[in-house]
């Protein structure tokens, strides 16, 4: 058995595609709660989106995540699994040797660090597309100190600022440079390094607990439950840094409000209090379960299928 295996990347791609379709509507709600204004709670946000934008509002920006997050998850699962085998090969002389808790922690934290290279631009484009609503644009100007300037006078009507993912990428590159695509990457590192440790480790522990027989693969129901619980744990604990990341990435659609991570934290705390860093935690918990359950199930079943030949 070789250390590097390509099927982990292919299985991650399939798991990622299935999770995007399941999780995107609630991801839109989460982004609006964290980076937008005027929403009282999760239910009010859902109702407001439906009233103003219909069902299509929940699927804004779906095309880009469907194309890109599949690649992102392919990289995450492929890198994590191959890193596990590399660590086992180096420490125990056999890539199939079960990983210790330390091995899992190192592999998952390295995955979180590497994932930002692909994940930051993907997240930024997704969030910019999700945030395209008139109230959000107005809030951007208000917080930038231009509350008295009507949007209409700035040439901004109710239509979308970005025509699609490619137009969004080209606009960001023109206006903000390559660093614009990586705005919020620092906050994403703070989110994903511990976040992936609290993602893969609970999943492994839950799988072992639900299926104590080491000689057999966990049944689909165990994979689904373990993946869902791990996803909820990871996303809830990552909410504070996710709020900062979302605000930094949604920022500068027209004028910049935040100078960096610390400035964003201080400004958010000053204007909205400590509770702002837990905005969207309920949505993260609800969304994290089906999305991650579907992702792990798609990954594991695909991997079993590929390795059955």
UniProtKB/Swiss-Prot annotation:
Query: Where are the bilayer-spanning segments?
Result: 9-29, 61-81, 105-125, 186-206, 218-238, 281-299
Any single Pfam family the record assigns to this protein: Mito_carr
**Which Gene Ontology terms of cellular component type are present?**
mitochondrial inner membrane; mitochondrion
Check the record and name the InterPro entries matching this protein: Mit_carrier (IPR002067), Mitochondrial_Carrier (IPR050567), Mitochondrial_sb/sol_carrier (IPR018108), Mt_carrier_dom_sf (IPR023395)
The record's annotation in Gene3D superfamilies points to: Mitochondrial carrier domain
Q: Which UniProt keywords apply?
A: Membrane, Mitochondrion, Mitochondrion inner membrane, Repeat, Transmembrane, Transmembrane helix, Transport
The cellular location(s) given in this protein's UniProt record come to: Mitochondrion inner membrane
Keyword Cytoplasm found: no
Q: How does it sit in the membrane?
A: Multi-pass membrane protein
Instruction: Name a GO molecular-function annotation.
Output: transmembrane transporter activity
Similarity comment text for this entry: Belongs to the mitochondrial carrier (TC 2.A.29) family.
The protein's name is Solute carrier family 25 member 48
Q: Which organism is it from?
A: Danio rerio
Q: Which gene encodes it?
A: slc25a48
